[in-house]
Amino acid sequence: MGWIPPNGRWLLVGGFEKCEKGGHAGRAAGDATCRLAYPPSVSNGAVARLCFAATFVIAAFSLGLQFVLDWLGVWDDPNIPGPSHAVRIWRFFSYFTTQANLLVVMTSLGLARRAGRDGPGWRVVRLNALTGITITGLVHWFLLHPLDDFRGLLWASDTLVHIIVPILVVLGWLVFGPRRRITTRVVVLGLIWPVTWLLYTLLVGRITGWYPYFFLDLGQSRPGVVALYCVAILILLFVVSCLFWMGDRWLPGRQPGRVATDGEPIDAPRLRPARRGR
């Protein structure tokens, strides 16, 4: 980085800065101005967008497969009459796994279109997608996976939404970011969705008698046990959010800036002119 004359510029060549100077020899150094041009973050690259696009396709396909299987009643006990299609749809979208994968689909599509996407609301949604899909993978692996005995399409669908998609999302964030998106405010606001989901699940379950997960079922467990599970889930969500927050601060990568096709930085922060030496 350095100071360059008005008609000089920083060119970004192979990810490194190169100063192209073409100022008039007689121009005083005190008149010089420059812009600090950050090298483009890796999250701005075509590889990053391709990764996010692949995550979007796999997550959307996985969610669609789950929906079709649920619509057809493949998961149902053949000895018990199944619910109506309207109830199936409502239950499908009541699962935390479904909502987390939906957030992944939306955010992955947004990042596939523009890898450096940003905004106050977007940051919260992106963190919800990261924490939600991570919790989906952890809870499934340690609590639900030991109880599963699926085969064929059931196994494939279950593995995709609970294991493959979480791994892709976390790896994509580790490699491509984008970074400098998570703040204390974002972490706090990110808790609104899981708290709302828990309250909704317990209230609707109390009314209808149906719960998406056995550990939240007040008909099978005492209220104190369910309360402990809820507290544990929220603590786990908060811890995972803090881990993403710390990674966002410490892992390599910087907030990407826009760079025109000719290498001229568009929105790089400006620095004050350098003072003349005395």
Language model region names:
Residues 96-98, 154-167, 230-231:
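Membrane-interface loop-to-helix entry segments
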Residues 57-76:
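Alpha-helical transmembrane segments of multi-pass membrane proteins
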Residues 87-103:
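Interfacial helix-start motif at the membrane-water boundary
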Residues 117-133, 183-191:
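Interfacial segments of alpha-helical transmembrane regions
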Residues 40-54:
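N-terminal membrane topogenic signal
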Residues 75-90:
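Perimembrane loop-to-helix junctions flanking transmembrane segments
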Residues 43, 47, 94, 208-244:
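Membrane-interface transmembrane-helix boundary segments in multi-pass integral membrane proteins
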Residues 122-124, 148-161, 184-186, 216-220:
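Non-cytosolic membrane-interface motifs at loop->transmembrane helix junctions
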